[in-house]
Structures are given as structure tokens and as C-alpha cells.
Design a protein with these regions (language model features):
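Active-site neighborhood of HAD-like aspartate-dependent phosphohydrolases
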Residues: 2-42
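A metal-dependent, Asp-based hydrolase signature
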Residues: 48-83, 93-96, 101-104
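Active-site-adjacent beta-strand anchor residues
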Residues: 17, 48, 110-114
Length: 121
């Protein structure tokens, strides 16, 4: 027996909104202020990871150690503040139309994110 589809899940970053340029810039700038190197291009490679994971990868490479919980919280907080200072991300092409189509078919569109950034939740 086929089950009736009730909802469609959409990721936010890179699916509904083009926010990655802002995420990569914020990561790059915050790491730079801490004397750490994370290029904008490399930040894209870490998309989908938790902030703690990204920070620890950079700490391991640059400092040969894991970041403390305090360092993780501080750096991620700084990154979030900087990200939130940027203009609102543009919708991805076709995202609005697709959401409207989903709704017109009687389905519930739902947004999901792996982000722990409170401003996005």
C-alpha cells in the first residue's frame, strides 16, 4: 500500500536561501581575528558540519590541538554576530515558486537546518 505524502522538507542554506557567501565570509573573518587561517573557499567545504566541528578542524590544523568548549562557544558566537550583521540572503532561484507548488498540491513545506545558530532557528 502506498503512503500518502504529507510534507516536503527543505534545507535552508543553499536550497531556499543563498546564504553560504555570508557564512563563508563570517567564518573567514572570525578565524582571521583569532590568528587562524580558514579561507572563504575552505569554509564552503565545511558546510553541513557543526560549528564546533569546523572550529576543531581549524584548531587541529593550525594549532595541533582541539579547541576548548569556551573557545568554541566564543568563536561561534562571534561568527553568528558577524553573519547576522550582513544583509538578508537572497532566495535561491525557483525556491519561492517551488514552495508555492508544494502548497498548491496540499502538502506542507517544512524547513530544516543543521545549524545551531539561534538566529536561524
Amino acid at each position: 500500500m502506498r503512503k500518502k505524502l504529507k510534507a516536503v522538507l527543505f534545507d535552508m542554506d543553499g536550497v531556499l536561501f543563498n546564504s553560504m557567501p555570508y557564512h563563508s565570509e563570517a567564518w573567514h573573518q572570525v578565524m582571521k581575528t583569532h590568528g587562524l587561517d580558514l579561507s572563504r573557499e575552505e569554509a564552503y567545504m565545511h558546510e553541513g558540519r557543526t560549528g564546533a566541528s569546523t572550529i576543531n578542524i581549524v584548531f587541529q590544523r593550525e594549532l595541533g590541538k582541539e579547541a576548548t568548549q569556551e573557545e568554541i562557544e566564543s568563536i561561534y558566537h562571534e561568527k553568528s554576530i558577524l553573519f547576522n550583521s550582513y544583509p538578508e540572503a537572497e532566495r535561491m532561484p525557483g525556491a519561492w515558486e517551488l514552495l508555492q507548488k508544494v502548497k498548491s498540491e496540499g502538502l506542507t513545506p517544512m524547513v530544516v537546518t543543521g545549524s545551531g545558530q539561534l538566529s536561524l532557528l
